[in-house]
Amino acid sequence: MARLRFEHTLAQGVRAQLACFDEMFPPERAAVHRMLARYGRETMWNLLQTKLADNAAKAPDGLEQAQKPWREALLLYNELLAENACCSLAELRIGGGELLAIGFSGRAVGRAKQRLLDEVASERLANEHGALVRRAERLYRSGWRGETDGRE
């Protein structure tokens, strides 16, 4: 793909879809929400349509059964979009300035926002300002900074 000439955004979209194509997830609300947050609305839509088409090609005799989980995931996808579910860092109802005020600094601000998004997408935390602030404060007090290699 590197030698073919594509627009940068098209190439990125194809790479993202290929990266998640083999990823299996149950047709459950939290799983679909996590995938939406990880890959974005457009890539998730394309993934679900591709999965439906792939199943149609692989299992023409048992098409209904093969497509059932992807149809359920598509219904959940549409439900989440209709509810304007939080699926990106920009949609979180807490800003970097508030995380700085709590005490996070530097890269830990971005890591904290990502952690909060993961919890919202897993449906363990509501995307409400007060709930996000309280969770961020608990994370900060616990010493969590999102470091994986000891460097900030």
Model-predicted segments: where are they?
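Divalent metal-dependent catalytic cores for phosphoryl transfer on phosphate-bearing substrates
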Residues: 1-66, 71
